[in-house]
């Protein structure tokens, strides 16, 4: 499963890697420590605004470049946690990218020190803020024209979600009153429904390999 490059090869990712390679290694490792401890903490800043300004001036990079670096590092740790990679396997994956060896060692060291804590925390959290609660469906028919009896059929799927902020786990008694319900309605023709089904089959196969 991890034989492929789990980090992909997008231009945005590679641009951020190029910036990371130029950073001073000891300071970069301190940044990684802050990043890894924010994995799974939704809507929480990694650095304060004043800290970001200091680091941007220190590294002589723009705010947009710094944001790209943080997002890239977060993505690497999120993928690492998703696949439950060991520090050595993380190194093997990073070798498939353009990341320099000294920065790869930083990721390895930080993950080795923090992986147990991060993985234990993530096991108590939902990765996505919306949790699927209920699925409903119905068929919809529409006459193609007044001169024919041919009907165009489509499937209407209704997905109901709970929007539950898990960051307040210490207030579980109050959380039950703070759950917001969201609804999504999707319409598929026959071809779209088949494509959607095949995607779900692919996802199920990957989940089975992780079970």
Swiss-Prot record:
Positions of transmembrane segments: none
Xref: PROSITE patterns: COMM
Pfam family, one: COMM_domain
InterPro entries in the cross-refs: COMM, COMMD10
CDD domains in the record: Commd10 (cd04758)
Organism superkingdom: Eukaryota
Domain COMM: 131-211
Coiled-coil ranges (or none): none
PANTHER family, per the entry: COMM DOMAIN CONTAINING PROTEIN 10 (PTHR12333), COMM DOMAIN-CONTAINING PROTEIN 10 (PTHR12333:SF0)
Similarity comment text for this entry: Belongs to the COMM domain-containing protein 10 family.
Subunit comment: Component of the commander complex consisting of the CCC subcomplex and the retriever subcomplex. Component of the CCC subcomplex.
Entry function: Scaffold protein in the commander complex that is essential for endosomal recycling of transmembrane cargos; the commander complex is composed of the CCC subcomplex and the retriever subcomplex.
Protein name: COMM domain-containing protein 10
Native source species: Dictyostelium discoideum (Social amoeba)
């Amino acid at each position: 499963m991890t034989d492929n490059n789990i980090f992909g090869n997008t231009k945005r990712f590679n641009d951020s890697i190029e910036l990371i390679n130029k950073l001073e290694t000891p300071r970069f490792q301190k940044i990684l420590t802050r990043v890894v401890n924010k994995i799974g903490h939704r809507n929480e800043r990694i650095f304060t605004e004043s800290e970001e300004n200091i680091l941007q001036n220190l590294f002589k990079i723009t705010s947009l470049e710094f944001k790209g670096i943080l997002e890239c590092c977060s993505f690497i740790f999120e993928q690492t946690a998703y696949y439950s990679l060991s520090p050595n396997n993380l190194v093997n994956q990073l070798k498939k990218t353009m990341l320099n060896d000294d920065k790869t060692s930083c990721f390895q060291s930080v993950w080795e020190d923090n992986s147990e804590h991060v993985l234990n925390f993530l096991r108590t959290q939902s990765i996505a803020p919306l949790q699927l609660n209920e699925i409903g469906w119905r068929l919809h028919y529409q006459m193609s024209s007044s001169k024919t009896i041919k009907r165009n059929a489509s499937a209407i799927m209704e997905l109901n979600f709970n929007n539950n902020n898990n960051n307040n786990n210490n207030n579980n008694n109050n959380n039950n009153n703070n759950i917001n319900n969201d609804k999504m309605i999707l319409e598929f023709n026959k071809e779209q429904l088949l494509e959607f089904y095949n995607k779900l089959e692919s996802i199920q196969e990957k989940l089975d390999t992780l079970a």
